[in-house]
Amino acid sequence: MNIFPAIDLYDKKAVRLFKGDYNQMTVYSENPIDVARDFEAKGAKFIHMVDLEGAKDGTTPNLSIVADIANKTSLFVEIGGGIRSMETVDKYLSAGVSRVILGTSAVTDEEFLKSAIEKYGEKIAVGADVKDGYIAIKGWLEKSAYTLDAFFEKMQNMGVKTIICTDISKDGAMKGTNLQMYSELSKKYSLDIVASGGVSAIDDVKALRKMELYGAIIGKAYYTGAIDLTEAIEVAK
């Protein structure tokens, strides 16, 4: 299983939100590139990034930071947050990003998702943000009509390879991850699933590893010191 340490970007800084709430933001670093280099020094091969400003308004104000990390480290960079047009996908991928995550747009704009997969294949991933059993959109502010299963079924049929699945109720709360949900999903679908939200102790990593998931994202637990990144990477192997 691959470990994806995470950087959320806002105003060119590395920040974290509590349960997706923009009013509960903690700034962890003024220099995200330093954080990424630190991940790399600790043995990380992947990095998960979200542009929180982009998630709100569909722009790319942190593109230069993302490009820097893609080009000045050897990390596999995946980025999400407000990617709603082919122009934005092109921008990120030509800046050196390895994989782009479509969130709201994958739920609301089937044609866009289809053409993105046709053009870029495995470089396109989908973010499934789960709230009360349904897929949430628009920076977690709205609930869509899709249940989790209906959405996974559809994505698999459309040729999506990787889904980053977040239980919003667990995100940033440091109360553990939704093991039952990931266990059920990994048994039902042949997608590469990345667990996100609430991975807050090394035991969470061990439990997810047993399910043979493709990946797990570690965010707040890294910044607060609750998880040692090097140990998590070892345990996940």
Each PLM stretch: what is its role?
Residues 8, 39, 47, 92, ...:
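Conserved, mostly hydrophobic/aromatic
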Residues 12-15, 19-23, 98-171:
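Conserved anion-binding
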Residues 46-62, 104, 165-175:
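Glycine-rich, proline-tolerant flexible connector loops at the mouths of alpha/beta enzymes
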Residues 48-51, 78, 101-102, 125, ...:
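Conserved beta-strand positions in the central sheet of alpha/beta enzyme cores
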Residues 48-93, 179-183:
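N-terminal active-site wall of soluble small-molecule enzyme domains
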Residues 60-67, 110, 141-150, 175-183:
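Charged helix-capping and loop-helix junction motifs
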Residues 77-96, 180-215:
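Catalytic cores of alpha/beta
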Residues 94-112, 197-201, 213-229:
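Glycine-rich phosphate-binding active-site loops on the catalytic face of alpha/beta enzymes
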